[in-house]
Curated annotation (Swiss-Prot):
Record's protein name: 2-dehydro-3-deoxyphosphooctonate aldolase
Biological classification of the source: Bacteria, Pseudomonadati, Pseudomonadota, Alphaproteobacteria, Rickettsiales
Catalytic function, reaction form: D-arabinose 5-phosphate + phosphoenolpyruvate + H2O = 3-deoxy-alpha-D-manno-2-octulosonate-8-phosphate + phosphate
InterPro entries membership: Aldolase_TIM, DAHP1/KDSA, KDO8P_synthase
Pfam families attached to this UniProt entry: DAHP_synth_1
GO molecular function: 3-deoxy-8-phosphooctulonate synthase activity
Length: 274
């Protein structure tokens, strides 16, 4: 029987209708966060898709020292708290160091471990100590079966509810490729699997001082992942991605999200029909 992670009234499982995890790459300010959350909550409510809001208070792995990192943990968590209280939606955000975990867990329902840090034992242990759901993004450098080692660490630290995210694998220089077999392989660990459709089209360092991306392939990869069968779809969304402070080339435009989700719901239903 496939593992199901429960979060409030949301059930996350590979055999259940997919959950959408979405929001802008980084927290840009209170007004912008509330604007995005309102749009996403209304849309997912209309389409009857369970929704978790995602945004980052710090982009600690920017390509360049000049890259905009975000508002920081204090201001960022304050804004995420407003989103959570105003729209009654769960929150996921990333932590980059052990010192951030306890404070972040006061607001976030899910702690996300960035792909580059997925093997950092001390960070995994600190996240585990919070008692929150821990969502780990598979490193671009890891084979899908290597996530078993991450699972073993988390379970040793007492984590009961784990989510793993596929976000592509390094394919030569400045490029990622999505191996859809990875979704099935990770699911064999009996962990709900999330597909990150927007970071999977990244071109790391592809613009020299920043990361490039191929937004036009987001929908294609999202359809493929949904056809395989996933617990969650992760998408970074922005009303004006070309002018966003980070990951603009990868994020999808807010106005285009509804049509994509309608298609994904159809794929999801067919895949999970008994």
């Amino acid at each position: 029987m496939q593992k199901v992670v429960k979060l409030n009234n949301i059930k996350i499982g590979n055999d259940l209708p997919f959950v959408l995890i979405a929001g802008p790459c980084q927290i840009e300010g209170k007004d912008h966060a509330l604007f995005m959350a309102e749009k996403l909550v209304k849309l997912t409510s209309k389409l009857e898709i369970p929704f978790i809001y995602k945004s980052s208070f710090d982009k600690a792995n920017r390509t360049s020292v000049n890259g905009i990192r975000g508002l920081g943990i204090e201001k960022g968590l304050e804004i995420l708290s407003k989103v959570k209280s105003e729209f009654d939606c769960p929150i996921v955000t990333d932590v980059h160091s052990e010192s951030q975990c306890t404070e972040t867990a006061e607001i976030a329902d899910i702690l996300q471990i960035p792909a580059f840090l997925c093997r950092q034992t001390d960070l995994l242990q600190a996240a585990a100590k919070t008692g929150k759901i821990v969502k780990v993004k598979k490193g671009q450098f890891l084979a899908p079966w290597d996530m078993k080692n991450v699972q073993t660490k988390l379970e040793a630290f007492g984590v009961k509810d784990i989510l793993f995210t596929e976000r592509g694998a390094c394919f030569g220089y400045n490029n990622l490729v999505s191996d859809m077999r990875s979704l099935a392989i990770i699911a064999e660990l009996n962990v709900p699997v999330v597909f990150d459709a927007t970071h999977s089209v990244q071109q790391p360092g592809g613009l020299g001082g920043s990361t490039g991306g191929e937004r036009k392939y987001v929908e294609l990869l999202a359809k493929a992942a949904t056809a395989v069968g996933i617990a969650g779809m992760y998408m970074e969304v922005h009303q004006d991605p070309d002018n966003a402070p980070s990951d603009g080339p990868c994020m999808i435009k807010l106005d285009n999200l509804e049509s994509i989700l309608i298609k994904l719901k159809k794929y999801d239903k067919i895949t999970k029909e008994k």
